[in-house]
Curated annotation (Swiss-Prot):
It is found in: Cytoplasm. Keywords: Cytoplasm, Hydrolase, RNA-binding, tRNA-binding. Belongs to the PTH family. The record marks 95 as: Stabilizes the basic form of H active site to accept a proton. It comes from Acinetobacter baumannii (strain AYE). One of its GO terms (cellular component) is cytoplasm. GO terms for biological process: protein quality control for misfolded or incompletely synthesized proteins; rescue of stalled ribosome. The active site is at residue 22. The lineage of its organism: Bacteria, Pseudomonadati, Pseudomonadota, Gammaproteobacteria, Moraxellales. This is Peptidyl-tRNA hydrolase.
Length: 193
């Protein structure tokens, strides 16, 4: 099992999107950078913000695409190819409509599941990367999805998402050590307090 050496957070750039549900992947990577003292800097070559640092003795790169969600592949694909990072060593954190706030799941492989950020990545690097799916809940009807993902969660939901992200942050050490099955068991067993 590969050690995770690239952790990507999906979201939209700009202060107007910073607190929206669609930016849950950004929240995860930004908090990970804070936890491990990794500086995130503008990286125009790869249309993103990136950083490199030591996580539990392992060299890890972080990436936030600044391309807007549905063009995430324009950042992730050239970045991973330039640094020769195999899909199996990539973790992509993203919001997940089909899971309630407070639910978080680590998954390996699969399709894009309707997620526009993943939809732009899978055709280029294949499906074999790992996904950290951060539940944001579904608004109930397809017509309301856009407003939901681009809206800000009420504080009760936000605290559930924050708790799930905190839990996943504590398991990153397993991921960078290549202990993906153990990380999956521990992350997927999470229940909000």
């Amino acid at each position: 099992m590969s050690n995770i050496s690239l952790i990507v957070g999906l979201g939209n750039p700009g202060s107007e999107y910073a607190q929206t549900r669609h930016n849950a992947g950004f929240w995860f990577v930004e908090q990970l950078a804070d936890k491990y003292g990794i500086t995130l800097k503008n990286d125009p070559k790869f249309h993103g913000i990136s950083g490199r640092g030591n996580i539990e003795g392992h060299d890890v790169r972080l990436l936030l695409p600044m391309t807007y969600m549905n063009r995430s592949g324009q950042s992730v694909v050239p970045f991973s190819k330039f640094y020769q990072i195999a899909p199996e060593a990539i973790l992509i954190a993203h919001d997940e409509l089909d899971m309630n706030p407070g639910v978080i799941r680590l998954k390996t492989g699969g399709g894009h599941g309707g997620h526009n950020g993943l939809r732009d990545i899978v055709p280029h690097i294949g499906p074999n990367f790992h996904r950290l799916r951060i539940g944001i809940g579904h608004p109930g009807s397809k017509e309301r999805v856009s407003g939901h993902v681009l809206g800000k969660a009420p504080s009760s939901e936000q605290s559930l998402m924050d708790g799930a992200i905190d839990h996943a942050l504590s398991k990153v050490k397993l991921l960078v050590q290549g202990q993906v099955p153990q990380a999956m068991n521990q992350i997927n067993a999470y229940k909000p307090a």
